[in-house]
């Protein structure tokens, strides 16, 4: 269990607050973005590398408070991590039977020890309290009342699906699921969805890792749409600037008298030379043309 405690934020060494070497945070370049195991911490001097989750759930490791650090960076000192590694060498994992098991159940009556990955394989329940900075581990039997398991009981649910497939009913089950999704989809589009519909979709998307790839693709769509609208705004800004410049030029022409706004458009549309020839025609020609009509 990693739990925050008040720490020294003063970098200047004195009798009460010596300089402590901290683990440095890095992100795995090969893990999917946002993956829960992608955050790692390491110490170049001590040649130690550890997953962030393994540090957080280690029972004997305490994270120090550091007001000067961003919320996304954990504050583990190298000395405490080395001490926890030494403690783990004496503890055997109840699942894989190998040493290095620094995670234990929060209740003293549960004496099992695990590696974090082994605890998840054994269907342990992880409890996180971000407000108090606590990370606890419970077995299925002693989980707090109302606690929603973060790791589902795959040992029960996987055989159920296999039995459905053996009975030829897996397609029927999936069709019912799709019908439910289509129903909720229609309600969302028609704005008639209930609060339970919204909660069901949110739980489906964020309550498990099944749709992790879908959410990552959706994030790409959001970024693409944002770039598209930014480009539209840029083009609209250019057009507005061009229109404003054109309007200013027209006003300048009017002020300088380059535009004769008083001229009427109801006058003769004939070219000047044709208009002059028509005016010089004799009255006889004009009268003859009138008689021919």
Swiss-Prot record:
<feature type="region of interest" description="Disordered">
    <location>
        <begin position="262"/>
        <end position="293"/>
    </location>
</feature>
<keyword id="KW-0863">Zinc-finger</keyword>
<keyword id="KW-0539">Nucleus</keyword>
<dbReference type="InterPro" id="IPR013083">
    <property type="entry name" value="Znf_RING/FYVE/PHD"/>
</dbReference>
<dbReference type="GO" id="GO:0005634">
    <property type="term" value="C:nucleus"/>
</dbReference>
<dbReference type="GO" id="GO:0050776">
    <property type="term" value="P:regulation of immune response"/>
</dbReference>
<keyword id="KW-0479">Metal-binding</keyword>
<feature type="zinc finger region" description="PHD-type; degenerate">
    <location>
        <begin position="91"/>
        <end position="143"/>
    </location>
</feature>
<dbReference type="GO" id="GO:0008270">
    <property type="term" value="F:zinc ion binding"/>
</dbReference>
<dbReference type="InterPro" id="IPR034732">
    <property type="entry name" value="EPHD"/>
</dbReference>
<keyword id="KW-0862">Zinc</keyword>
<dbReference type="Pfam" id="PF13771">
    <property type="entry name" value="zf-HC5HC2H"/>
</dbReference>
<protein>
    <recommendedName>
        <fullName>PHD finger protein 11A</fullName>
    </recommendedName>
</protein>
<feature type="zinc finger region" description="C2HC pre-PHD-type">
    <location>
        <begin position="25"/>
        <end position="61"/>
    </location>
</feature>
<dbReference type="InterPro" id="IPR051188">
    <property type="entry name" value="PHD-type_Zinc_Finger"/>
</dbReference>
């Amino acid at each position: 269990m990693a739990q925050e405690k008040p720490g020294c934020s003063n970098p200047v060494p004195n009798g009460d607050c010596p300089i402590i070497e901290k683990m440095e945070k890095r992100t795995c370049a090969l893990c999917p973005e946002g993956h829960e195991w992608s955050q790692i911490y390491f110490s170049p001097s001590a040649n130690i590398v550890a997953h962030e989750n393994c540090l957080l759930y280690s029972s004997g490791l305490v994270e120090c408070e550091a007001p000067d650090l961003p919320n996304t960076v954990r504050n583990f000192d190298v000395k405490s991590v080395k001490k926890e590694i030494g403690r783990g060498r004496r503890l055997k994992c109840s699942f894989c039977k190998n040493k290095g098991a620094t995670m234990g159940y929060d209740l003293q009556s549960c004496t099992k020890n695990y590696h974090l990955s082994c605890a998840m394989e054994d269907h342990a329940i992880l409890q996180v309290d971000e407000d108090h900075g606590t990370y606890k581990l419970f077995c299925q039997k002693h989980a707090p009342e109302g606690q929603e398991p973060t790791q589902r009981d795959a040992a029960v649910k996987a055989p159920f699906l296999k039995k459905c497939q053996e009975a030829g009913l897996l397609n029927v089950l999936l069709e019912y699921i799709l019908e439910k999704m289509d129903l909720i989809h229609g309600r969302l589009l028609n704005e008639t969805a209930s609060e339970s519909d919204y909660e069901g979709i949110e739980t489906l998307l964020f309550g498990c890792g099944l749709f992790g790839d879908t959410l990552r693709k959706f994030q790409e769509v959001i970024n693409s749409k944002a770039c598209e609208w930014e480009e539209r705004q840029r083009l609209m800004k250019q057009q507005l600037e061009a229109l404003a410049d054109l309007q200013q030029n027209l006003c300048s022409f009017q002020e300088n008298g380059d535009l004769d706004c008083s001229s009427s458009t109801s006058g003769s549309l004939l070219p000047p030379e044709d208009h002059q020839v028509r005016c010089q025609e004799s009255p006889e020609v004009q009268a003859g043309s009138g008689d021919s009509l």
